[in-house]
Amino acid sequence: MQIKSAKFYLSSQKEKDCPKTIMPEYAFIGRSNVGKSSLINMITNQNKLAKTSSTPGKTQLINHFLINNSWHIVDLPGYGYAKTSKSNKKHFQKSITDYFKHRKQLASAFILIDLRHSPLKIDLDFILWLATNKIPFSIIFTKIDKLTKTEIDNKLLNYKKELEKNWEILPEIFLSSSKKHRGKEDILNYIDKINQSII
């Protein structure tokens, strides 16, 4: 799939304030500083569509981007940022859970995980929560340019072993590097395949 147009559409604090459209949506979420905004910019051929920052927890709203005038990318607040206040954590958690539980336009979620790290409970718990609530999702492992091929293979194997504790069939998995533009085609082809079945 080719991205012919990509533009900011709307920022919302709550799920009920999100766009009232019937277009399919693909939500991108992960721990703070996982490279989410950089990935969105990479797959949309934009440099500044999603605001990037070295400060974790920068994304604090539900941000919709209109792609090819037919579907949305949704940039969700990152989870697990320790320096966020308790009240903000509670607000972010509610806005995220409300979005996933009630947003009928959601076609699939993409969970972003920094492959440099060992499997973390916060990521595994969130993945399990999505599965328990029957929310379709895939996993994108980010920042693979920081690893050797052997390190990628070993770390990917560790994650698969953890996931296999709860699943016989693993979710779709993508490897990406925004810096090296890796994974873009696979992710867009996957989205296109889903779009073809519902648009």
Regions found by a protein language model. Give the residues of each.
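Conserved nucleotide-sensing/catalytic segment adjacent to the nucleotide-binding pocket
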Residues: N68-L106
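Structured catalytic cores of enzymes that bind and process phosphorylated ligands/cofactors
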Residues: N33-V34, I40, T55, N63, ...
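Canonical P-loop GTPase G-domain recognition
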Residues: I3-E15, K146-I199
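Conserved G1/Walker A P-loop phosphate-binding module
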Residues: M1-K83
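Helical mechanochemical/support elements of P-loop NTPase systems and associated helical scaffolds
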Residues: K48, L61, H72, N88, ...
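Conserved nucleotide-binding/hydrolysis micro-motifs of P-loop NTPases
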Residues: K58, W71, G78-Y81, R116-S118, ...
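Conserved C-terminal guanine-recognition region of P-loop GTPase G domains, centered on the G4
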Residues: T97-L170
